Amino acid sequence: MIDSSLPLTDIHRHLDGNIRAQTILDLGREFNIALPATTLDTLRPHVQVTSLEPDLVSFLAKLDWGVKVLASLEACRRVAYENVEDAARNGLHYVELRFSPRYMAMTHRLPVDGVVEAVIAGVQEGCRDFQVDARLIGILSRTFGEAACQEELAALLAHREGITALDLAGDELGFPGTLFRNHFNQARDAGWHITVHAGEAAGPESIWQAIRELGAERIGHGVKAVEDPALMDYLAEHRIGIESCLTSNVQTSTVASLAQHPLKQFLEHGVLASLNTDDPAVQGVDIIHEYTVAAPAAGLSREQIRQAQINGLTLAFLGEQEKAALIQRVAKG
């Protein structure tokens, strides 16, 4: 189902949600951190979804184990580097890795600024070694509140040349986007692109807020957009992208099943929607699974899957010359 003549992208992929089980085991041993299991096989059910039944609480608990072992800046550099290696192994030509430096720093009270620097270094090394084009998106974890997000933003801005865009993630219901207008004004002043998690837990009004108040060019998940016909029209007309994550949305109970996922509706409506993974190490999937298993199960035709692949490049936070160069590189094999 993947068109090998086109670049394969993943533009919604959490770096801190893609920490290998083996790495969690290694770092746990290195720093004498108590883990729920002591071998890879017994650890895996604690850090990766192994049940078909959606369970948000369990999903989040598995996600947290990855950052609980980040006890040094070198550990942060390592997982960033391995994220690029994983992208190369998955056959990705271009990947946007998003991360919350505060989330990565909090368990062991690492310097947030140092985490940003370590992640940038790891990704740059990975791009050099594995010939993958990767960009970084900084996340503000709104669950920590406005003041903490300003500190997180300051750490990202201190290394602005290594960051491509800003995202807002976390408790969408308790911390609406309007609280973070000033933060995103600063991001736009820095020349960054804007993408926002919205319409995942909250309704269409959260997506409108992300667009009108934060300047979102893309929306993460955005499944609730289908509840508002005017919003669907607006997304299509203004070419605001939807970063769809099929398997993730089922595992977190955002949608009831793949068959009920709105990605097909987005594509039929002319919305620029793309296929992405989200937290692949936790989900136990890769981008190939999303194209060959999840997308057909969501009702997408072969042509719609190809369109989603095209949309991934269209929506990428790259200049037109960079996109053209990527297309040419893939064509040459």
Curated annotation (Swiss-Prot):
Its EC number is 3.5.4.4. This is Adenosine deaminase. It catalyses: adenosine + H2O + H(+) = inosine + NH4(+); 2'-deoxyadenosine + H2O + H(+) = 2'-deoxyinosine + NH4(+). Its cofactor is Zn(2+). GO terms for biological process: adenosine catabolic process; hypoxanthine salvage; inosine biosynthetic process; nucleotide metabolic process; purine ribonucleoside monophosphate biosynthetic process. It comes from the Bacteria. The gene is add. Zn(2+) binds at residues 12, 14, 197, 278. Catalyzes the hydrolytic deamination of adenosine and 2-deoxyadenosine. Keywords: Hydrolase, Metal-binding, Nucleotide metabolism, Zinc. Belongs to the metallo-dependent hydrolases superfamily. Adenosine and AMP deaminases family. Adenosine deaminase subfamily. PROSITE patterns: A_DEAMINASE. InterPro entries: A/AMP_deam_AS, A_deaminase, A_deaminase_dom, Ado/ade_deaminase, Metal_Hydrolase. One of its GO terms (molecular function) is 2'-deoxyadenosine deaminase activity. NCBIfam families: aden_deam (TIGR01430), PRK09358.1-1 (NF006846). The keyword rRNA-binding does not apply. SUPFAM superfamilies: Metallo-dependent hydrolases. Binds 1 zinc ion per subunit. The keyword Hydrolase applies. The active site is at 200 (proton donor).
